């Protein structure tokens, strides 16, 4: 026999529903919150007052009448007071954002990583410095409710271990525990794969908002991806779905860092572009793409090969997932932008119905897709139990958290 929910359980669930709506939609009238939740007006009024007292939301009195009846009070999330630190740990870069409730980017720190300089201790030191800089810049009296981390590798959700990140050279790195120790914090730290988080961010706040079936492709040194199916992230057994960069498209191709031969990554990554075009090692990708798009001859043949390889992988993804949208993020969006006609030619061989339905677009959040997705990991505990999570969290002081 199922035990009926207690009054406290119902209240906690309703507060979570209300705060999640504010987090996703931003400023919303009480009348609209009533309609969206299906709760009565007095319940919504009480719940919003609870969120205001907890300093999770604020209410704004209506300026004037927009129609008949009494204008409804507007409720919005306290973006400046409640925030997370979101990290994108890439191969060539580190990005740290302070993101307020409601998805507002409040502050950022970016750092380029030197080629091959990915030792765990050194990378961890850089990440810790970025996090502390963001916390030091937070206004006094605000609260950090969590830290979300996107990593370009296979991540175990349960224990926060980076199982395999070939482009960083990491194997079984307990990143969550290491970060908690170095930051000396009890804040929840949650890790996720960069491709999964990029897909989540574009679905929640980017070009895929409102759609149900989306494939996100991103990369720089490596290629990753994430899939939204039926409006939900596709996790797979163990949460390792979406490693599309290691889809084999040429069994006789180059050896990948993962040890296999002919992975998609070996044909379309930044390194692959330089090799295909004959550009000297270390040449900025932007220089190669500019030369190609302006009609210079030297990169033409190589870029066409890259475009065909990109198109082959895209065609495979369309056939397998039948998405409404394929989103190109990271630096691969720039490769797609200059090879789009070649990529689209590859869709000729795709099942007609799938090819007609899919759209190919670049990421709406640009380079921030992964970090914005990581922020959602940081907010997860708060959105599940708003008042319980806020209890005991320290206020940010002038010199840090």
Language-model segments: what does each one mean?
Residues 1-112, 116-143, 184, 252, ...:
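ATP-binding/phosphotransfer module of carbohydrate and carboxylate kinases, centering on a glycine-rich
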Residues 100, 157, 228:
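Short, acidic, Ser/Thr-enriched surface-loop or helix-capping motifs
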Residues 105-108, 112-148, 153-215, 337-349:
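Glycine-rich phosphate-binding loop and adjoining helix at the ATP-binding site
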Residues 211-267:
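Glycine-rich phosphate-binding loop of actin/hexokinase-like ATP-binding domains
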